[in-house]
């Protein structure tokens, strides 16, 4: 006999061919026992992917979903790639439910993450100022935070939740790039906030590719709608780290600059309930400035020092292939063939 669902919320899980990682994330979802589960898996690139794909499907099989849960599956027969798979999977889930939690196969949540997202999804469901709930906090524990969470314009997609009303605003065709007035305003916002200078060129490249890159689509939508994210005062997500088969990162932990290495070794915490709610919806600017510094956005000297640190670490550990690849990327950027290196 199956256990009853513990929390009335939907969870979308994106996975591919990494059963060891996926098992860790699935185990936490299994403890939380959400009422609905969306399972999205991309198709194989070739025969080498098949064993991992089948192992992941076994983890998420009906026999392993031992609680009462409405299960939706979208298993692709052809390989779509990371993009547009993430965009397609999220549009699929949010076409069925009004609000949902999203976890990729390297985002391990604390148990507090689920009731936190559920409460935020219900509380701010109709507040157009709020576009998403984040789980990953780059502070780990935000100082001088008297409430359970705060508001910010900078966020991570390592474990998040949102609403259909937000996803419906996503412009998968990058239509905003053809709106001259919107682009003037967006360029001013990017410049005034000190955001990455290649953001708009990146959006143009993504649009030209004919694929939907949900991160640039989501970020542009947040900026164009002056939206805020909800950030827990304590970090609720572990990312499983750097590896050659990571979705968004590759490389070695030992050759990663210390400031970035900290992000991948950060602890996840639990929140205390009942939650303490902020009285006002106002951005935590101090947090934003710390995140900018961590990521070297608008800090050219920090960015340069990180590059030198990475070069030193690669030399120290004899990782010459990474050095040559970095040099090649820098050369392509110099001659205009790689704008985002």
What are these regions (language model features)?
Residues 1-102, 107-341:
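An acidic/histidine-cluster motif and surrounding catalytic segment
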């Amino acid at each position: 006999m199956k256990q009853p669902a513990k929390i009335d919320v939907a969870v979308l899980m994106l996975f591919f061919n990494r059963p060891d990682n996926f098992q860790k994330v699935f185990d936490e979802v299994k403890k939380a026992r959400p009422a609905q589960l969306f399972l999205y898996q991309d198709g194989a690139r070739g025969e080498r992917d098949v064993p991992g794909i089948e192992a992941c499907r076994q983890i998420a099989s009906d026999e392993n979903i031992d609680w009462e849960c409405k299960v939706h599956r979208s298993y692709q027969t052809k390989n779509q790639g990371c993009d547009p798979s993430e965009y397609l999977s999220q549009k699929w889930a949010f076409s069925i439910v009004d609000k949902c939690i999203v976890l990729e196969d390297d985002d391990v949540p604390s148990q507090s993450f689920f009731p936190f997202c559920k409460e935020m999804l219900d509380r701010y469901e109709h507040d157009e100022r709020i576009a998403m709930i984040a789980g990953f906090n780059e502070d780990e524990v935000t100082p001088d935070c008297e409430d359970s969470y705060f508001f910010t314009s900078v966020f991570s997609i390592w474990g998040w939740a949102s609403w259909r009303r937000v996803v419906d605003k996503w412009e998968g065709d990058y239509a905003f790039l053809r709106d001259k007035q919107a682009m003037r305003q967006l360029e001013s916002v990017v410049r005034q906030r000190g955001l990455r200078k290649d953001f708009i060129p990146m959006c143009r490249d993504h649009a030209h590719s004919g694929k939907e890159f949900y991160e640039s689509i989501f970020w542009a939508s947040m900026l164009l709608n002056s939206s805020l994210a909800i950030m827990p005062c304590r970090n609720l997500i572990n990312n499983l780290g750097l590896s050659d088969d990571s979705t968004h990162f590759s490389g070695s932990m030992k050759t990663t600059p210390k400031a970035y290495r900290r992000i991948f070794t950060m602890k996840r915490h639990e929140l205390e309930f009942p939650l303490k709610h902020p009285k006002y919806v106002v951005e935590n600017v101090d947090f934003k400035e710390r995140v900018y510094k961590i990521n070297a956005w608008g800090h050219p000297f920090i960015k340069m020092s990180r590059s030198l640190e990475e070069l030193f670490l690669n030399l120290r550990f004899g990782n010459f292939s990474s050095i040559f690849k970095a040099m090649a990327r820098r050369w392509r950027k110099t001659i205009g063939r790689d704008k985002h290196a």
